[in-house]
Amino acid sequence: MYYSSPTCFVLITIFAVVVTQLIFMRTVSSLNMTNAYLNHKCLANQGKYKPGSWYEKKLQSIIVSIGSGDGFTLGYDMMALGKDSDYVAVTNQCRGDSNGSMCRSCFATAIARVTRCPRYKGAIIWYDQCTLQISPFDTQGKFDKDNDFCMSNKKKMNVDSFGEKWMTFLDNLVGIALKDHLYAAGDTRFGTKKLYGMVQCRLDIYNNSCRECVGHIAVKFQDCWHGKQGARVLGSGCNFRYELYPFVGSNKRGRNLN
């Protein structure tokens, strides 16, 4: 069930489009070492498009436009064409510490892996550094309650109060993110260790929806992350992660929240 609208990501079969994106990848090889593929979902209920169709042509046009634009500086870009049944949109959101060339490279990497969903109108793909979403619907300002997932460390925390501690920390991070481009990273003391955390909402999501999105995935996947030494939960509109080691770029490592 959608909070407002679906997530997405689709397939193009023309390698020329991928090559166009690769022109902008100055550090793809080195980035891929730290830009792990995380997951993807092909949304069959959004239908498929035919080779040479209007949808495919407009999709390719959008991808080329985003790849040659300046949205990577901000770390976010969204472009759409058409209306009603001919509507197609592409949204790229990079992690807050992955702007510029890293964001551009992640976008190109995601486009190059688009064959995971051959000719699907709707799908989404997650990488460590970015999330690419392609949709036949308008998703601006909306998040999807269905297409999300959790990854966690098998090792457990030896502290009963971890859940309460993390939720307080996460709430503090969300508060900071709402004042700073919907992204925040920081650390807090947890016994004898430091707990590092990060939270982000897609830039077109409004403040109240951002907090609701994070709260939704935190509760939905509580059995996955609770008590684990590290975890990340990702959706189409927001995501969070925590570890016992720093994992974001030093320029965006954030503040101590003790």
From Swiss-Prot:
**Pfam families noted in UniProt:** Stress-antifung
- What residue stretch is flagged as signal peptide? 1-30
Which keywords does UniProt give here? Repeat, Secreted, Signal
Keyword ATP-binding belongs to the record:
no
Residues covered by the Gnk2-homologous domain: 37-139, 144-247
- Gene3D superfamilies assigned to the protein according to its UniProt record, in alphabetical order: Gnk2 domain, C-X8-C-X2-C motif
Give the top-rank taxon of the lineage listed in the UniProt record for this protein.
Answer: Eukaryota
Localization, per the record, is:
Secreted
List, alphabetically, the GO terms of the cellular component aspect.
extracellular region
Give the family per the record.
Belongs to the cysteine-rich repeat secretory protein family.
Q: What is this protein called?
A: Putative cysteine-rich repeat secretory protein 16
Q: Which organism is it from?
A: Arabidopsis thaliana (Mouse-ear cress)
Please name the taxonomic classification of the source.
Eukaryota, Viridiplantae, Streptophyta, Embryophyta, Tracheophyta
